[in-house]
């Protein structure tokens, strides 16, 4: 009987939670088809996802208002940095929401930190997507790239790098060569400033002895991880 009561309490709690979320989403909770819901757990979980998406959309809109240049920058760099190979491709996001979706899909920090938005807005570094050409819409690796094609970071699920990234390195070097041929003098000037800022940041991280606290890299110095990740262009 105790187990039955606990089960009933859980069902009632889930139902109340479901109705609360439905109300927040503007769904008429007085409608019988709503309050006498079938497949309660499934519908509850669907509303959780809808509410999460709406909150992220609102957050993306607020971020886009704060960093108004990002959408235009993404449009302007698209012809220069996008590249399609037989196995891999580089995709330029359309703006803030694309980048946030990427970060959510891969469960890493891109899209959750102002420093990435600031770097894009100042054209110090861009966020690009490494994708498999056959699965062009599926998040694979996220890249942070300086204006000359130097790759600062390459991260997949949970900020990791897996062995499969080694297979993509030849393509990334090929992409860097292609990009170097597309660069303007303005791009090269931006890249020089970007390099100076990167080196200054690395030196500050060394002095502060900043360590990673979570994940597979916990305990390592952040600067050592970033230096190891760096893939400078040969151009």
Q: Can you describe what each PLM-predicted range is?
A:
Residues 1-235:
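Glycine-focused motif/segment detector
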């Amino acid at each position: 009987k105790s187990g039955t009561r606990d089960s009933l309490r859980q069902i009632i709690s889930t139902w109340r939670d479901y109705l609360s979320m439905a109300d927040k989403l503007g769904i008429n909770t007085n409608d019988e088809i709503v309050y006498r819901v079938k497949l309660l757990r499934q519908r509850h979980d669907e509303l959780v996802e809808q509410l999460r998406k709406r909150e992220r959309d609102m957050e993306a809109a607020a971020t886009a208002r704060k960093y108004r240049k990002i959408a235009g920058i993404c449009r302007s760099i698209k012809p220069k940095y996008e590249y399609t190979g037989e196995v891999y491709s580089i995709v330029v996001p359309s703006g803030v929401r694309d980048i946030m979706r990427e970060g959510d899909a891969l469960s890493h920090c891109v899209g959750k930190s102002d420093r990435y938005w600031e770097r894009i807005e100042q054209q110090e570094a861009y966020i690009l997507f490494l994708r498999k050409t056959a699965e062009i819409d599926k998040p694979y690796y996220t890249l942070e790239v300086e204006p000359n094609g130097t790759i600062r970071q390459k991260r997949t699920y949970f900020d990791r790098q897996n062995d499969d990234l080694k297979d993509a390195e030849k393509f990334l070097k090929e992409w860097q060569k292609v990009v170097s041929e597309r660069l303007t003098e303005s791009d090269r000037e931006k890249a020089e400033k970007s390099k100076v800022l990167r080196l200054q940041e690395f030196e500050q991280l060394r002095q502060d002895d900043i360590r990673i606290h979570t994940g597979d890299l916990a305990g390592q110095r952040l600067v050592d991880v970033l230096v190891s990740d760096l893939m400078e262009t040969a151009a």
